Regions:
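As written
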Residues: 1-2
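Hydrophobic/aromatic docking surface of two-component receiver
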Residues: 8-9, 129-131
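Signal-transducing coiled-coil linker helices
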Residues: 9-46, 54-64, 114
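Protein kinase-like catalytic domain
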Residues: 22, 86, 144-151, 183-186, ...
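Catalytic-core segments of nucleotide cyclases and related cyclic-nucleotide turnover enzymes
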Residues: 137, 168-198, 204
């Protein structure tokens, strides 16, 4: 009798148990999907769909710590004249400009690279295990060129970007130090008239 209870042969009972299992699975899948959606939302910048500041920093730090012997490069990227865009054309155009720059970055870096928005009009991009510095210089120039077609991008004429680049030293594992170098190089690009890239430690 106990064997009959543990292995029901009545079709109605079997279907009921199967339905319960399927319902439970659907509920679990729904919960997992919601959890995954919340996780993604917590890691991604809502406007640009790039990584947010905390997630980008964490991802880059992980690579620096796990592959300290490799050559990596960090880009610090800033939209030139962004305050003027907001003041003259309004915040809607400002948001559009940020989204355009984000799309340019997303389309020019590979899936193994890390791209994040770290502030209002500030971004970082991280190229890992690079073969040569020349590849990084070429990537920076591609980005500068990509934003020049203002009409196609529907952005104001005065919008450009400035870029600062910092390469890792052997066994350099601090994201903070690397970012400070890239940010210093970005400042040099701004001082040089904007719409250009500069490398940390290299005089213009």
């Amino acid at each position: 009798e106990s064997d009959f209870l543990s292995k029901p042969t009545e079709p109605a009972i079997a279907r009921h148990r199967i339905d319960n299992i399927l319902k439970t699975n659907r509920r679990l899948n729904h919960i997992l999907q919601k959890q995954e959606a919340l996780r993604i939302k917590s890691e991604v910048d809502e406007m640009t769909h790039l990584l947010n500041k905390a997630t980008a920093e964490h991802a880059i730090s992980h690579i620096l710590l796990s592959t300290p012997e490799e050559l990596h490069a960090l880009f610090a990227i800033d939209i030139d004249n962004f305050k003027a865009v907001n003041d003259i054309f309004g915040h809607k155009m400002g948001d559009h400009t940020i989204s355009v720059v984000a799309c340019i970055l997303a389309s020019h870096f590979s899936g193994s690279d890390i791209i994040g928005r770290i502030g209002g009009d500030e971004f970082v991009a991280f190229m890992r295990d690079i073969a040569s510095r020349q590849a990084v210089y070429e990537k920076a120039q591609e980005l500068l060129d990509a934003i020049l077609d203002k009409e196609a991008l529907s952005i104001p004429e005065n919008v450009t970007i400035s870029i600062g680049i910092a390469f890792t030293e052997p066994y350099e594992t601090s994201y903070t130090t690397l970012f400070q170098k890239a940010d210093t190089a970005l400042g040099n690009s701004k001082k040089s008239g904007k719409q250009c890239f500069s490398e940390y430690g290299v005089s213009a």
